[in-house]
Amino acid sequence: TAQLYLDQFSSGSTDAVVSALKEIEAADAEALILDLRGNPGGYVNEAVGIASQFLKGGVVYIDRDADGKETPQNVTEGGIAQDIPLVVLVDGNTASSSEIVSGALQDAGRAQVVGVTTYGTGTVLGEFALSDGSALRIGTVEWLTPKGRQIWHNGITPDVVVERASDVQPLLPDAVRDLTPTEVKSLADP
């Protein structure tokens, strides 16, 4: 089983994930854990690109404007990891584009989502200039999962709820990258 941690959806994230997926495939991994815990989101086009690596077709998410008009955002064909068994890890800090990806994979029955309910961002903010030079930012479009579930204020509810005990601190890859094995062992619970 391979684990792929994605800390944000920045420019080039899809290309980086494709490269990682090729390495995972070459290593003959039997399953993949996509870790989106703590991921605040980012560029929605990168979310579409990444979700599309795992989906054979269909919709990644739906835009719904203030008039209620819904516009589906479709999968980009040619994904390279459409058959590997998949689990997506989420937490309360999984937001925005991360919710699009986890919701799309969950709705398609493509992945089991594990963790706690995500943040519940789910909107596009429009900025409007005011006469005094300031600006007003308000939600102009909301995101729905492919099955029409509202992300805003609801988040993505995991298939399997696993809450972190209050006395356990998360250990993220960057936090342990430079530690020796002895230092990592000293962090383990008694």
Feature locations, PLM:
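C-terminal "post-core" interaction segments
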Residues: 1-190
